[in-house]
Structure formats: structure tokens, C-alpha cells
Amino acid sequence: MNVSPSIISRWGSQHLVVLLTVLLFCWVCPTEAQTFRIDTISDAVFQRMQGKSYPKGCIVSRSELRYLTVSHYDHQGKTHTGELVCNKRIAADLIDIFRSLYKAHYPIERMRLIDDYEADDERSMRANNTSCFCYRAVSGSKKLSKHAQGLAIDINPLYNPYQKGAKVQPANARRYCNRAASFPYKIEKGDLLYRLFVSHGFSWGGSWRSLKDYQHFEK
């Protein structure tokens, strides 16, 4: 870092120390653009959802949903801007949670609308995609899922699978059913992500008795 003699003569030594400190901080700690927004569902977003996460006959109104954009880190420490559609009732909760996760550099690999995977939950989970709203039934039943209301979110699903007996979803996640093993993106009871969701009134599928859904938080 070069500082000209003219600056030294004009500012004096004390001012120069302040200037150098500020410049050094900006060089070492560049400001990262952060995004934590809640928006109504725009025409462009709604068009992406049509016939996919928002199929014909969906009884959840567009006005009940919100589009979120949030900054997050991946396991390599790279920053990304993710997107979610959720129920407006949990939008502020999710923004608070993801802002805290971002500050802590908690890793989330991918966060795209499930419509980018044709609303195919298996495809989305295989890609380790974090998602929220999708108008669909609970796996193996005709009962509407909390996802159908936008009141549930699946986080890092490849590494935090759904397991009921021999059934595992996504199908390529069987190795991650061993919760005693150590691997990236694993959600554990008591970790930061768990504590944040529980403190905002969510329940965790990893605590269920009849099955385990380690990726799943709902309200």
C-alpha cells in the first residue's frame, strides 16, 4: 500500500494512522453484499410456479405466499443468494433464521425454487436443494403436506434424509442415515440451525418417533 508524501504532510502522523487503519480494514474485510428480502409473489415468479409447485386446483391463494431472497454460505465458504417461496405467516421467522445462519457461516449448499426441478421432490433432494412451498401430499399418503401450505422447509435434504423403515428419500442418501457419522451439512439436535428453528416455534422431523425426517422443520 503506497501513501504519497503530500498526504503525510497534509494529514500529520495521527490522521495518517487512522487512514491506514481504515484502508487496511477495507482491504482485509471487504463488505459482502447481503440480501434478506420478503416480497409478494410477482407475475414472473408465479409463472415459474404454474403447473409445478402451484398446480391446477391448488387451494392456497397466491396472496398467502411470499417470495424470499436470502444470502447463505456453502461448505466451501462461498456466498450465494438463495430463493424460497413460503407462507406469509413464517416469512419473518425464516428471514431472522437465515440472517443468523449467514452471520455464523452455517453452510447451505443450494436454495432454488423446487420449480427448477419440475416440482419433483426426489430430484430436488438429490441435488441437496433447500426448499419450502410445494403443493403436494405427505409421502405415502393423500394428506396434504405442510409444504402444501408453505409452512415447512427441507434443509440440505441429501445429507438429512427422510427415513421410515427401509424407505429412504432421496434414494441416494442411505449412507447419511447413520447419524453417528460425521459429514458436511448434517443437522443435529442442539446445533445452531436446530436451536434457531425451535426458538421460532418450529418442530423438527428428526425428533419424530414413527419415522425420521432430518431435513424437515414445520410450524
Predicted regions located by residue number:
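Active-site acidic/histidine clusters and adjacent loop/turn architecture
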Residues: V60-M125
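Bacterial N-terminal signal peptides that target proteins for export
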Residues: V3-L19
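Sec/Tat signal peptide C-region and signal peptidase I cleavage site
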Residues: C29-A33
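Active-site-adjacent loop/helix surface patches within enzyme catalytic domains
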Residues: R112-H147, N160-Y162
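Catalytic cores and adjacent binding grooves of peptidoglycan-active enzymes
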Residues: V138-G140, L144, G150-K219
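Structured segments of extracytoplasmic/periplasmic soluble domains
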Residues: Y73, D93-P107, R136, L158-P161, ...
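N-terminal module-boundary/linker segments of secreted carbohydrate-active enzymes
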Residues: Q34-K78
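Bacterial N-terminal signal peptides
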Residues: V17-W27
